[in-house]
Amino acid sequence: MAYPFQLGLQDATSPIMEELTNFHDHTLMIVFLISSLVLYIISLMLTTKLTHTSTMDAQEVETIWTILPAVILILIALPSLRILYMMDEINNPVLTVKTMGHQWYWSYEYTDYEDLCFDSYMVPTNDLKPGELRLLEVDNRVVLPMELPIRMLISSEDVLHSWAVPSLGLKTDAIPGRLNQATVTSNRPGLFYGQCSEICGSNHSFMPIVLEMVPLKYFENWSASMI
């Protein structure tokens, strides 16, 4: 989860988020090199007194500044497209969870189980227990098994919402009348926090998401107790 004054991304907990973090670093390094080159050229222009007023064209330079940007864009586009396809792939999910956005709470349905569904509301500040996070804690957490591919089906009952958990690299729009899907795979157990990431009304900031990733044995015990 995020912490105060954090400048970087949250710690990656899923393979997709690891890829996104690497892509972010890769792109940032390219931007840094280009910015350094531009600043260096500007500093030369401001400090040198040498000019070439008689130069009418320079085909070699024009060729370089046409080809080089194209190569840079390809170096950015290829890993980006690869990650986009990875995010769309869902290979043999062991579990499917249907997520519905409402004003202003989430409802979850485990479609592989009969009558395993619940609503998830934010816990008011006055009801928080010691150690719980303000505006991020919910009354019913989404419990899922770790290290297994899980399919999330996401939609909305009223207006546009967005189901997002940054540490897992997830952000999927919840659109009325449309069913979007995403893959959840966690590399380790723990609590992972998110929020609605699409402005949906006056209580938009009071729609937290809490995923509790646990070993498969604990998930089976939890699901049996909920049915």
Curated annotation (Swiss-Prot):
Stretches that traverse the bilayer: 15-45, 60-87
GO molecular function: copper ion binding; cytochrome-c oxidase activity
Residues involved in Cu cation A1 binding: H161, C196, C200, M207
Main subcellular localisation: mitochondrion
One GO cellular component term noted in the UniProt record for this chain: respiratory chain complex IV
Reported cofactor(s): Cu cation
Listed EC numbers: 7.1.1.9
Reaction catalyzed: 4 Fe(II)-[cytochrome c] + O2 + 8 H(+)(in) = 4 Fe(III)-[cytochrome c] + 2 H2O + 4 H(+)(out)
Cellular localization per UniProt: Mitochondrion inner membrane
Intervals, Mitochondrial matrix compartment: 46-59
Parts of the chain on the Mitochondrial intermembrane side: 1-14, 88-227
Cofactor binding note: Binds a dinuclear copper A center per subunit.
One Gene Ontology term from the biological process aspect of the record: ATP synthesis coupled electron transport
Keywords: Copper, Electron transport, Magnesium, Membrane, Metal-binding, Mitochondrion, Mitochondrion inner membrane, Phosphoprotein, Respiratory chain, Translocase, Transmembrane, Transmembrane helix, Transport
Bilayer disposition of the protein: Multi-pass membrane protein
UniProt-annotated binding residues for Mg(2+): E198
NCBIfam families xref list: CoxB
Subunit structure of this chain's protein: Component of the cytochrome c oxidase (complex IV, CIV), a multisubunit enzyme composed of 14 subunits. The complex is composed of a catalytic core of 3 subunits MT-CO1, MT-CO2 and MT-CO3, encoded in the mitochondrial DNA, and 11 supernumerary subunits COX4I, COX5A, COX5B, COX6A, COX6B, COX6C, COX7A, COX7B, COX7C, COX8 and NDUFA4, which are encoded in the nuclear genome.
Its job: Component of the cytochrome c oxidase, the last enzyme in the mitochondrial electron transport chain which drives oxidative phosphorylation. The respiratory chain contains 3 multisubunit complexes succinate dehydrogenase (complex II, CII), ubiquinol-cytochrome c oxidoreductase (cytochrome b-c1 complex, complex III, CIII) and cytochrome c oxidase (complex IV, CIV), that cooperate to transfer electrons derived from NADH and succinate to molecular oxygen, creating an electrochemical gradient over the inner membrane that drives transmembrane transport and the ATP synthase.
Family label: Belongs to the cytochrome c oxidase subunit 2 family.
Protein name stated in the entry: Cytochrome c oxidase subunit 2
Species this protein is from: Dacnomys millardi
Record lineage: Eukaryota, Metazoa, Chordata, Craniata, Vertebrata
